Amino acid sequence: MNILLLDGGKAFGHSHGELNHTLHKKAKEVLTALGHNVKETVIDAGYDVEAEIEKFLWMDAVIWQMPSWWMHEPWTVKKYIDEVLTNGHGKLYHSDGRHSVNPTEGYGTGGLLQGKKHMLSLTWNAPIEAFTREGDFFEGKGVDVLYMHFHKLNEFLGLTRLPTFLCNDVVKSPQVEQYLADYQAHLEKVFG
């Protein structure tokens, strides 16, 4: 399988981006050992928009590695999305999917990457209970509800969702070795 790894880690403020870079490297190591072909982009290091479009055409699956900043992706990841996906019109998506015969139906079905998949690998300082416990901050709804927009932007291209990987408590109670072991197990289960 051809897998594109997108590293959205960024040094900014009190965040140094190191955990996301470390998880990105672990994914490359594990997926290569499993026999997959891997291409990668460290978003904050810069990228060529046309080369990134070609990577999306090449890949069978993309893994978005990123921290949560203020309940969503860092601005550098959003900029990458705006530049790469918008310029991918005609290659990554044809249209929004609607037709003049019935313009109220079919929105989001114009993607050209059907059969390909996406996965999120996220780092949060929030404890897992903030996502899973009723009455807690995220009302027991889980992390994927917060990332519906992100899943939908991938779906707009035609990609289907793979199970999300989540590291919790990354500042207050970091467990880096456990995160790496859990991520390896997750990758082996999903891509093994």
UniProtKB/Swiss-Prot annotation:
Binding site for FAD: 15-22, 68-71, 107, 123-126
Organism domain of life: Bacteria
Record flagged with keyword Flavoprotein: yes
Cofactor(s) annotated in UniProt: FAD
Any one cellular-component term (Gene Ontology): cytoplasm
Keyword Cytoplasm: yes
UniProt keyword list: Cytoplasm, FAD, Flavoprotein, Oxidoreductase
Main location: cytoplasm
SUPFAM superfamilies the record matches: Flavoproteins
Catalytic activity entry: a quinone + NADPH + H(+) = a quinol + NADP(+)
GO MF: NADPH dehydrogenase (quinone) activity
UniProt cross-references to InterPro entries, sorted A to Z: Flavodoxin_fold (IPR003680), Flavoprotein-like_sf (IPR029039), NADPH-QR_MdaB (IPR052397)
Locations listed in the record: Cytoplasm
Pfam families the UniProt entry points to: Flavodoxin_2
EC number: 1.6.5.10
Family: Belongs to the oxidoreductase MdaB family.
Summary of the function given for this chain in its UniProt record: NADPH-specific quinone reductase.
Subunit organization: Homodimer.
Record protein name field: NADPH:quinone oxidoreductase MdaB
Protein source organism: Haemophilus influenzae (strain ATCC 51907 / DSM 11121 / KW20 / Rd)
Organismal lineage: Bacteria, Pseudomonadati, Pseudomonadota, Gammaproteobacteria, Pasteurellales
Gene transcribed to yield this protein: mdaB
